[in-house]
Amino acid sequence: MKLLLTSSMILCFSVFANAQNIKKQEAEKIIKTYFSGYLQKDWNMTASQLADGFTFSSPAGDDHIPIAVYKERCFPNSKFFGTIDFPEIMVDGNKALVIYEITTTNSKVIRNVEYWTFSDGKVKSIECFFGGTGVGYPANAQNK
């Protein structure tokens, strides 16, 4: 009986632990679909990747803002997105570190790093990091 109970507990814990992890291919697909919404100026495509309770943070005063505020503050920048490249996407467990380069519609380059967390196949949070001069914003991007 003890063996059965112990085995059941181990199985439950391992299933729960594995449910928290995301495969690299799945994370990359979510990330690229999220950014495709920006490239296509399609909020619904981007929003479809976000979990309930999603938050966004950045050095621009965005401290764990909710989806509605994120849409209002950040998504309008999609009008500046020309192309995007991903030099690196690193996934570990339910987290990813994403390095990306956006070339704006006026040929300026933005390079950001973001720390993503996932929950049930959706993006739970994004923490964006860029230089203190606000280079992460398209209006402040540097010439190519």
Positions of PLM-derived features:
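Short hydrophobic/aromatic-rich beta-strand segments that constitute the beta-sheet cores
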Residues: 56-57, 98-99, 125-126
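Low-complexity, intrinsically disordered terminal/linker segments enriched in charged
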Residues: 127-144
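Short, low-complexity N-terminal intrinsically disordered segments enriched in polar/charged residues
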Residues: 4-6, 14-44, 48, 139-144
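A short gly/proline-enriched turn/hairpin at secondary-structure junctions
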Residues: 53-65, 77-80
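Short beta-strand segments enriched in hydrophobic/aromatic residues
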Residues: 50, 100-104, 130
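Short, solvent-exposed coil/turn segments at beta-strand boundaries
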Residues: 92-95, 116-124
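Surface-exposed, charged secondary-structure patches
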Residues: 71-108, 113
